Amino acid sequence: MNGIIVIAHAPLASALRECVLHVFPDAAPCLQALDIPAQQTPEASLEQLRALLRESGASDHLLLTDLVGATPCNVASQSTDGVHTRLLAGVNLPMLLRAVSYRHEALDTLCER
């Protein structure tokens, strides 16, 4: 099963995760959220994300961010050293619900859906 991590400006990532868990409560182990507060340094955010990737237990990860070029997306693009990931920007609730419903598919197939 793929790990899915939402990385977004606070509090969007946590809010999206909570909405999805309302529909898919069994997805909690594979769905993580990383809220990036305005005052947090990119280095601190990167370390938090790397910790989530290490601790997730999944071999593949789908990283979903809010805005291309913003800190969450930049942090996500730097976190992939040695980890099999795919990064998609523009996360929204329908996208995340779809990703969670197909979380058992191969990572490349999941990204195409």
Describe each region flagged by the PLM.
Residues 1-113:
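N-terminal loops that bind phosphate or other acidic moieties
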